[in-house]
């Protein structure tokens, strides 16, 4: 099912509850989006649906409204601890957002209780909250929901509570599978009743999603909603009101271009994407130091407890910058994001589309910009063909200020900045090596010297990818970087303590090594001969071109060693035999006669 149109909520064949319509008016949504007008009637007629629609198309309301309508039509009212609907979503941020949208509706229906189960919170408190207040509608991430099904100690029997389940929703299904939640979802499905309505929502249809459809849905109606005015054969995967741009610049120009761009738009709201958590940590601190009048927040997947708070804070801001990884790339609806900036291209092409989709949400306008290195220019055509995502070039700004010396000065003044920069560089190189588009993003073509200058490094890090390479275009600082202190006095004190401990250990180890060297000569010699014999055997097995006279010498030495070990000859005789063997080989070599010729 593809050809659907927008329309008024009142035009639905199955009428909505007056209080649902009232909540929609409060939210400022007088009309349905195509995905909503296609999905809601089917869901309400007890059909399983598998919906594919571009990011920012209004998928959340497409399942929130049917959940409420189906629960309102139940013959038997839900008790406090009976679960009528479950929404599973891949990230905490998306779960928080869905819970917030749902609360706009449930406040009009006090008979329904809702509960949010996500990581970063105390699971014991979640259990107590459910026991006290109930949870007719659960919004959860897969890991926490699976954990709740397995909990027995706190007196929670969730398996019994879900026997009344009417609706299951799997939101961002492709991301659920990409993030490795397949096993958790399968476990959860085993606990749920078969007689239920299931909705699967996704921005892309992959083979893995298709497998999940077969496993979790019964005779589903498939919905694929396209952007208006675009031919089916070339369906654009980003919102039609999104302006996509790219900028080609060298690795050591990129940061200056980014700061110039952000300074010229300080009153706007931006998302800045980096490829790794370490890059977010480093460049987030750098931007804080250089854009003092702008509110800057950082968020990434390794933040366990701060993420929820940071996400909510940024949503409330009128202007500011959120520096983030792909943890913010899917489904998140942040009000009035003006620009999505991709400092690093994502590891796969579909993530590019999802990043861009954080702006131009539900009919609003928005813009996106990706920074590319000269060697990555082919990525533009790749996106146009592979993701149906055309991009327009944005000219390089020529009047930018070089801020890299300031970053270097920050690293020299504080070891924390120096270490963050080194970690960020290493993590970026490692992520680059794993890029899905390896024909375009080739590690061997990367300008490591320019990249190091762009990261404002004081010296090149030691890492396998740089081993054996020379960097004449990179000038390291002329100081011992081990002498750079932490600004934080407590951290510096701990560092000095560790350095002293290492010095002592090194000194003790050197003493032990000297003692080991004073072993009996005969034992050392025997060990050396064993090693020699093993190497000779290995070379022979590998088809080595070792000549016959060397092999004969080795065999003679081995025979002597065996006799010496068995006590058949003395140490003096052993040494004499080795010398005789070596002398004989030299003489024969000088004469040009091999051992085999003499023996014959």
Curated annotation (Swiss-Prot):
Q: Where is this motif: Q motif?
A: 9-37
Gene3D superfamilies named among the record's database cross-references:
P-loop containing nucleotide triphosphate hydrolases
* EC number of this enzyme: 3.6.4.13
Q: What would be one Gene Ontology cellular-component term for the protein?
A: cytosol
Which residues of the sequence carry a binding annotation for ATP?
Answer: 53-60
Composition bias type Basic and acidic residues, residue spans: 499-513
Instruction: State its role.
Output: Probable ATP-binding RNA helicase. Has ATPase activity and is involved in the maturation of precursor large subunit rRNAs.
Could you tell me what this protein is called? ATP-dependent RNA helicase DDX55
